[in-house]
Amino acid sequence: MKFYCLIRFMIIANLYSSYQISLPGTYPSQILLDMKNSPLVRFNISTRDYKDETLWIRKNSTFVYIDTAVTTANVIFYLPIGQVRQMVFFKRPISRLLTSNNLVKFINTGSYANHTFKTELSPYLSKTNTPLKKYEIVVDQPTGENPPAGFGSLKPADFLNPGYKFVLTSELVGAYTKRSCFVDPMDSLVPIDYDHVRTIIFGSAGMEILMKMGITLASMTISTKYNPPIELIISAKYRNLSLLWPPRQQYEPVNKGTGRPHWIYLLGVYRNVSDSERDSYMNMIKSLGDSMDYHFLISRAHAQMLILAAEDRLVDEMHSFRNVIARLFVSLFAFIRNAFQSGYTSLNDIIEIEADLRLIVEGISSAAFRKDASTHFLISGTPIKDSKADLIKSLLSKVIRPISGHTRPLSAIQHLFLLRSAYALDIPRQNGSLSEQVSTVALSFIENIHSEAMRDILSWNTTTKHALYYAFASILQRPLTEWGASRNARRAILLASSMCTEEHVIATELAIQELYVKIRSNADPIHLLDVYTPCLSSLRLDLSEHHRIYAMADVVFYPDIQQYLKKKSHEGNMKEDDLETKAEYILTKLRSPLIRTLSAYASEVLSCSDQDLLEINAILILPVSGIGSYVVSRRAGMQGIVYTVDGVDVNNQLFITYTRMPCTTTIGNIVPTVLSRPSGKTCPYCGCVLLRYSADGNIRYSIYISSPKLQSELIAFGNSSIRRFNPTTAQIYGNSLLLYPNGTIVRILAFESERVTIISATYIATAVAGSIIALTVIVITVRMIIINMRYNYQGYNKVIDVDDDIRN
């Protein structure tokens, strides 16, 4: 038998015989609850006295907990989201996942006695000495000449050296920090008061993470479609948390008695010590106990993010994913705690924490949300809002405006600080002139880096990698409705593909392997952008192909990798192959999903192809014009002008298709030609792409002719200072094609007719000696054969003579 109870939530509770609760004073909302065992239903309605923290009402908020008389049947009801929106008895974020059946199925699994987890944690180091690598600069501290001040004291130049400027915490947060009532998202704990600073929600269609950050208390809830929900709570020491059921029972912290400055609580599914989920929970908790230094903790979060990207099993991915989220969570809490303890924080840290948050969330969306990465979202309540955000944008505009007008040059580190500030404030995603100016500055910086890379004078250091990421993000995150957004994005993708040469790919893979070895040895601080490469922003899709053995000649090997492999020598080649595989996983998972990028910036490719076949066969996509793109693939089948590339391995064929709307198919012909020298100041080759491939069907590079200077180097051929344009220094044999923006492709004869073969004297001497020896062997062999034939002939004649004598 089912019992239906009609409940109305208002401010004052009156209980009627029909189990109808009427709380007059607010607009009523009716919710029909389906309960079993109606005779045993009872209502526990408590009001909170402000002086008594054990009761539940505060500032017109009433918490209603409904249970049954039978202790084994207690449940907390989770209602449809439409009904939750009508409930006014407490304030909480609306979440389609946190109100799903996950909680109904899992939150009450097992006995309450098993909800407390115990583990041995290493001793807490209150003064952890962490080396801090801050983009090759020294982090300053406030002095008498440079004391912490309010936001109003900021100047435009401060954003070019943010580590020198310090802001008062009280000025930064102001009224945004408020006394609030903490309502456990899992509805398992008695609500308590705390000083709320910010709320962060992010996830995708199949996952949601909710973080509530305070000064002395913070909580994080992970809810997914296919795994039980988990909640972590960090609280000031000696502040007890109580369970709703059994009533008032104290909930034990996991790390009680370890000497750490905060207690850690865990809510989740746990049956017994052999439960596989328990190991995952313990790893999360251990990641929270190392230190309360923000820079150390966020470095651990970045390192765990790389481990997540390197995983190839879903089980390992989920464990690594939880560890990433846990470390990000405790990093944010440490930043807030330290800022309030010291009373100030640097402008650099304010910007860095927002940038790190967005960066890790985007990394998670690519590595962990791959199936629904396009649905990922981030809702971040930040103290930098309203008038403070307007002030910062105004100051940034004063810095960016002269740079976008090419009247003020900046160094790479200044570009990094400026573009990171725009990224942290989410300016690229906003409409208006400021995002356009940021995009202009970013594109100019990318073009300068591209020019240096083509001349082999670029140092791929930490500053360059980080600045390039923020530059590409400033362009690729702009709304497509904004003026010039699509044009700049297509140009940026071409520049990224141009820098993604075969030598660069293998050097990047080795750098990632070295970084992974350092992560496993707990060496220097790690940042996710330390592995960034323009290949991640390009549409070159063959990064995982093992065909670059000949490119290794120009790559410097890393001693850390050699030492690591030497220690693991008993495992043979397995460990080396494992490192290579992990590097390829990281490159593959951290790049933006192909279909999402194409739908935004090269929709003609999707319109003229089958998406499934495109993802399987395409190895390079070049959006060479505003209306057309080249697709290099292993198989034909796309609609457009289809070119068959001759002179390659039949088992590794290459097809090039020029796609544009409307999607019509024709057969193209690649014509060999000699490039003519343009007259005057014209630039007929600007916008073209030099595509070089090897005889085994592998793409070596696709150089984008982005300026008249590069055109001059291209037509200089043997006199070119750019080695990829010089046939005498192009190294490996192969063919070179020039792809025009209008869909025409020609083969450049200069790279075929001017090959230079260099034969060493040692090789010649060895060849001559070998020839002499071979000739001697042949002569001796022939003489032996002749002698043997003579002997046999004479013996045969003697036999004939004897036979004749017998007959006679």
From Swiss-Prot:
Top-level division of the source organism's lineage: Viruses
- Major location category of this protein: virion
Its membrane topology is listed as:
Single-pass type I membrane protein
- Residues of this chain annotated as glycosylated in UniProt: N44, N60, N114, N240, N272, N431, N461, N719, N742
Signal peptide (residue range)? 1-17
Q: What does this protein do?
A: The heterodimer glycoprotein H-glycoprotein L is required for the fusion of viral and plasma membranes leading to virus entry into the host cell. Following initial binding to host receptor, membrane fusion is mediated by the fusion machinery composed of gB and the heterodimer gH/gL. May also be involved in the fusion between the virion envelope and the outer nuclear membrane during virion morphogenesis.
- What is the protein name given in its UniProt record? Envelope glycoprotein H
Q: Which organism is it from?
A: Meleagrid herpesvirus 1 (MeHV-1)
